[in-house]
Amino acid sequence: MENKFDHMKLENQLCFLLYASSREMTKQYKPLLDKLNITYPQYLALLLLWEHETLTVKKMGEQLYLDSGTLTPMLKRMEQQGLITRKRSEEDERSVLISLTEDGALLKEKAVDIPGTILGLSKQSGEDLKQLKSALYTLLETLHQKN
C-alpha cells in the first residue's frame, strides 16, 4: 500500500535522475575532453561553432540555455586559449560575434570520435536513445517556456 509520502522518495524524483545522469555523463566526457584541453561547456560551444562557424553571443546563449553571465567568462577563456575570436558586429554594435579560429576549427577533427565513444558507453539501443533524446527535448522545451 502506498503512503502519502511515496512521491517524496528520492528514487521517485525525476529531477534527481536527470541531475545524477547529467553528472555521470559529464564525468565520462572529462578524460576525452582533457586530451583536448577543453571543458564540457566549452565542448558544447565548439559543437555549435563547428556547425555554424560564426554566431552571436545571444544566439549561442539561446542554443546552450546559458545566460550571458555564464557564457561570457567561458568565451573569454576560449579566446585566451586561441579557440575563438570575439568581435562587435558592424551592423549592430550591441551584438558580439563569436567565430572559430583555425585552432578551434582543427579541434573538430580531434573530437570526431567523442560522440560515438560516449554513446557506446550507454549500452542502449539506437531506438531507445532516439526516444530518450526526443522525450528530453520535449521536457526541456516545456520547462524553458515556463520561464
Swiss-Prot record:
Task: Give one GO term, molecular function aspect.
Answer: protein homodimerization activity
Q: Where is this cross-link: N,N-(cysteine-1,S-diyl)phenylalanine (Cys-Phe)?
A: 15-16
Highest taxon in the source lineage = Bacteria
Q: Which UniProt keywords apply?
A: Cytoplasm, DNA-binding, Oxidation, Repressor, Transcription, Transcription regulation
Quaternary structure, per UniProt, is: Homodimer.
Q: Which PANTHER family does the annotation name?
A: ORGANIC HYDROPEROXIDE RESISTANCE TRANSCRIPTIONAL REGULATOR, TRANSCRIPTIONAL REGULATOR, MARR FAMILY
Q: What is this protein called?
A: Organic hydroperoxide resistance transcriptional regulator
Organism annotation: Bacillus subtilis (strain 168)
